[in-house]
Swiss-Prot record:
Gene3D superfamilies cross-referenced by the UniProt entry: HUPs
Annotated catalysed reactions: deamido-NAD(+) + NH4(+) + ATP = AMP + diphosphate + NAD(+) + H(+)
Residues binding ATP: 46-53, 160, 189, 211
Source organism of the structure: Lysinibacillus sphaericus (strain C3-41)
Annotated binding of Mg(2+), by residue: 52, 165
One example GO MF annotation: ATP binding
Name of the protein in its database record: NH(3)-dependent NAD(+) synthetase
Entries under HAMAP family matching the protein: NadE_ammonia_dep (MF_00193)
Protein's job: Catalyzes the ATP-dependent amidation of deamido-NAD to form NAD. Uses ammonia as a nitrogen source.
Pathway(s) served: Cofactor biosynthesis; NAD(+) biosynthesis; NAD(+) from deamido-NAD(+) (ammonia route): step 1/1
Length: 274
């Protein structure tokens, strides 16, 4: 088995999909989990205004709508969480995503004061964070807030990790990578677009240039620039196609270096890293 085949198998990517079937799989997954655990009253997700959170949020709300219809009461909810750091450049996209998803409820928590306080406390202790690490601080603060809201509402936290993100490790460990359920795991980037198109999402929410927007020295830095490889190349690789040698080596290097992100904390019994 080649490394490419191993990665595809691990991330459960299919070369082609039926969008309606994948939508149904994700909705049923969320419903089954909620029904299995009596303490679950709904789902929580941070909404950034990008493709991945818009898709995951819409799937969650559809699952909640079906659950409530089945039980004949408003037992379940989906809470969409806005988590800007100060003023967000693409705030209108965030509002458009909320309008499209139509969540049961929403909260807005500006994380700037909390992040800045943490950065200041570390500086006072003699630890000066660089811009990249401060970006990770933002991602972890956002996830911390989501878990607090989930705890107070009987919710579980959803993540937006998908195959094109998982292969590169392009997320913050214990930040956006730290969630309870990952409804779109198995899909690559273009397949996520297919689902949103099927769900009649406003096109600009899934055709915009993807960016994590965590770094202040490089605001709105496109993912593809940060990674040095295009999502089309990543998706082609995940679908089993041949891609040029340079991006292939880059992707496989990312995958091998980020294995720790796809595992629980490592114990003496783990050997994958050796």
């Amino acid at each position: 088995m080649t490394l490419q085949q191993q990665i595809i198998e691990e991330l459960r990517v299919q070369p082609t999909i039926n969008a309606q079937e994948e939508i149904r799989k994700s909705i049923d997954f969320l419903k089954e989990y909620a029904k299995h655990y009596s303490f679950v009253k709904g789902f929580v997700l941070g909404i950034s205004g990008g493709q991945d959170s818009t898709l995951t949020g819409k799937l969650a709300q559809l699952a909640v709508d079906e659950l409530n219809k089945e039980v004949g009461e408003m037992k379940y909810s989906f809470w969409a969480i806005r988590l800007p750091y100060g003023v967000q450049a693409d705030e209108q996209d965030c509002q458009d995503a909320i309008d499209y998803i139509k969540p049961t409820g929403s909260y807005t928590v500006n994380i700037k004061d909390a992040v800045d306080a943490s950065v200041k406390a570390l500086a006072n202790a003699g630890v000066e964070l660089n811009d990249f690490v401060k970006g990770n601080e933002k991602a972890r603060e956002r996830m911390k807030v989501q878990y607090s809201i989930a705890a107070m509402n009987g919710g579980v936290v959803l993540g937006t990790d998908h195959a094109a993100e998982a292969i590169t490790g392009f997320y913050t460990k214990f930040g956006d990578g730290g969630a309870d359920l990952m409804p779109i795991f198995r899909l690559n980037k273009r397949q996520g677009k297919q689902l949103l198109a099927e769900l009649n999402c406003p096109e600009h929410l899934y055709t915009k240039v993807p960016t994590a927007d965590l770094e202040e020295n490089r605001p709105s830095l496109p993912d593809e620039v940060a990674l040095g490889v295009s999502y089309d190349q990543i998706d082609d690789y995940l679908e089993g196609k041949e891609i040029p040698e340079e991006p292939r080596q880059l992707l496989e290097g990312y995958y091998l270096r980020s294995q720790h992100k796809r595992h629980m904390p490592i114990t003496i019994f783990d050997v994958f890293w050796k």
